[in-house]
Amino acid sequence: MGPQARTLCLLSLLLHVLPKPGKLVENSDFHLAGDYLLGGLFTLHANVKSISHLSYLQVPKCNEFTMKVLGYNLMQAMRFAVEEINNCSSLLPGVLLGYEMVDVCYLSNNIHPGLYFLAQDDDLLPILKDYSQYMPHVVAVIGPDNSESAITVSNILSHFLIPQITYSAISDKLRDKRHFPSMLRTVPSATHHIEAMVQLMVHFQWNWIVVLVSDDDYGRENSHLLSQRLTKTSDICIAFQEVLPIPESSQVMRSEEQRQLDNILDKLRRTSARVVVVFSPELSLYSFFHEVLRWNFTGFVWIASESWAIDPVLHNLTELRHTGTFLGVTIQRVSIPGFSQFRVRRDKPGYPVPNTTNLRTTCNQDCDACLNTTKSFNNILILSGERVVYSVYSAVYAVAHALHRLLGCNRVRCTKQKVYPWQLLREIWHVNFTLLGNRLFFDQQGDMPMLLDIIQWQWDLSQNPFQSIASYSPTSKRLTYINNVSWYTPNNTVPVSMCSKSCQPGQMKKSVGLHPCCFECLDCMPGTYLNRSADEFNCLSCPGSMWSYKNDITCFQRRPTFLEWHEVPTIVVAILAALGFFSTLAILFIFWRHFQTPMVRSAGGPMCFLMLVPLLLAFGMVPVYVGPPTVFSCFCRQAFFTVCFSICLSCITVRSFQIVCVFKMARRLPSAYSFWMRYHGPYVFVAFITAIKVALVVGNMLATTINPIGRTDPDDPNIMILSCHPNYRNGLLFNTSMDLLLSVLGFSFAYMGKELPTNYNEAKFITLSMTFSFTSSISLCTFMSVHDGVLVTIMDLLVTVLNFLAIGLGYFGPKCYMILFYPERNTSAYFNSMIQGYTMRKS
């Protein structure tokens, strides 16, 4: 025997074992005969869940419990909708809808009504191989009102694909159409209710809340959904969560339950949270709120789930206004014309009983006090806007529109025929109609995307007791139109419920304890900023080209700094460079015109041009130091100038060495001198030194880079120094060290030749040039070790220009002076006489 067969056998057994009720009045509030019957499940009497009635096989008598006004109000909505449809000529013309409605007594009476709706007129549920041709007592079921009951009934009806439309069961479990294929509902799911609550709390910046839940599936599921939703954001934290004790049907708490409730209230009094979210059926809250009043709580915000958000009995506890502000999530308000009068109307003789149905009886179809009790609450029901009533009303109309299509109705008549539940279910899934200005249809999960309202409880008799303050759309998932909130606080200020006050802009959060909502605020330091949308707990560093001040929320571009033409140091250096360029050009021209003279040959002859050309190029390339650095300018700074300078120094050094060799070493080492001259020793030496310098420069560039970068000014972080690679300074120091060595060598050789003939005695000129070069290089190295920034660039440029000027004017200047102003000394005879005089002095 398969699982489905075993289920059917059990259902048949229960149908026969459960007691038979008494006689039914023909056309009562619970029954209306018709061509097609709808089943209705409503809670007319309230009984909290206890295990006492489950210990024996007996249906409880619901009229022994407290009457529930809202349940009767919803049942009247179904009766009103059926009567309205039967009186409508355009919807189901010629067809009378009937109903069978049962009081499910909240959670106590679900199985028996389900079996009653399944069975045929003989109270039998046959076991068949195929139920596609089976016609149960009703074609569809409206209700019940809570998720536990809806799931229980759906587990029975789904086997037969009987359409079941619930009007207030919001459990997300019902969205699973594999387990509940025939379940639909005219309210949004619990996920949307939770989202509306969360957006409400975020809007008012309540991030420190208390959650109280009932000890049943409703409380557990909704609190779990809330916790899941809050894990997606750190904006809201739960200070603590407690389970409310559920009293027995007598509403009298046992001592253990009283202690549990006292502990909860004590924690609530001591917590800094002022927002309390309550997920519980209204039945469990009467005792709780009486205790809240006894403890004299004030200043709280109570957020109600849909189960008690518009409960008139709780609202009737007018002293609750002193405990704080009551907000709740419920279905949108839609006024139904004529329903308020119908609700309190005495029943009139019903429609004639068609031959297609027979009168049957079931239990819990009496409520003697319902009408009178409802009349006493009629005013508050009218002012509340008949919120959930519209969900029942639209559910009946959804069945009617589906039946209208299934029967092939036109404007005047319908084709009455057998209607099987699975056929009607298929049509219900595809209904799409307008009812009282609202477009109604079912989505893929079987939910009708109705709007939700955020309501506030009011106790002013002239106002709506459940005033709408905001609206939530399940389609857009957004909360809109938040207004008209009357806070029960001094000066009508928004209550504050925060574990920690919000940080100021530019302050990061540092968690304190386990909750992300509890934190201390720390300032973001200069150079960092806070991007709250990305990370509220860490200050982010600004990119290299940007900066920020203390407590900034964004970075700004640093002010770039580099040598510019309008600056005084740049102008001074440019004048010196121009002087060097034109003087070198003049020297080059003079030496070219007097190339064959003894003065030019004694200065080095062709080697002079090897010095003058790099000097001229170096002076011409000085502008690369000015303006934003580029790859080319960095290359020139790191390579071109130092190579040119090394060529000049090596030429001077080898020239000094060669003069000393001629006069002092040629006689002692004639073969060495002959070898030196035969193989062009001076040029080999210059080439060798140049090759070493090029190798050093290339190695330095390969080890670093020649790409310009921006660096922070150590004195002002707001300034970004645009310069070459930072290791450029290290390379410059290394290159300068080699130039210092050449300067020392040149100076040494020049000093050794201080006694040479006057025309060949260049010691004082070379000493001047080398000493200046040595001093300036030492000064540059010292300056670079102490300072940074644009000053280094200025100093580097100034030293470079002065070094070249020292060579150009210090070495070549005196020779040009002699050539131009003392031509008589620029003759071979004069030079020979000077050599003879030197020889005679030495001999």
Curated annotation (Swiss-Prot):
Domain of life assignment: Eukaryota
Cytoplasmic side: 592-606, 664-682, 753-764, 811-843
Protein name: Taste receptor type 1 member 2
Biological processes per GO annotation: detection of chemical stimulus involved in sensory perception of sweet taste; positive regulation of cytokinesis; sensory perception of sweet taste
Membrane topology reported for the UniProt record: Multi-pass membrane protein
Glycosylation sites: N87, N296, N316, N355, N372, N432, N484, N491, N531
Family statement drawn from the similarity comment of this UniProt entry: Belongs to the G-protein coupled receptor 3 family. TAS1R subfamily.
Signal sequence region: 1-19
Function: Putative taste receptor. TAS1R2/TAS1R3 recognizes diverse natural and synthetic sweeteners.
Subunit composition and interactions: Forms heterodimers with TAS1R3.
Expression sites (tissue/organ): Abundantly expressed in circumvallate and foliate papillae.
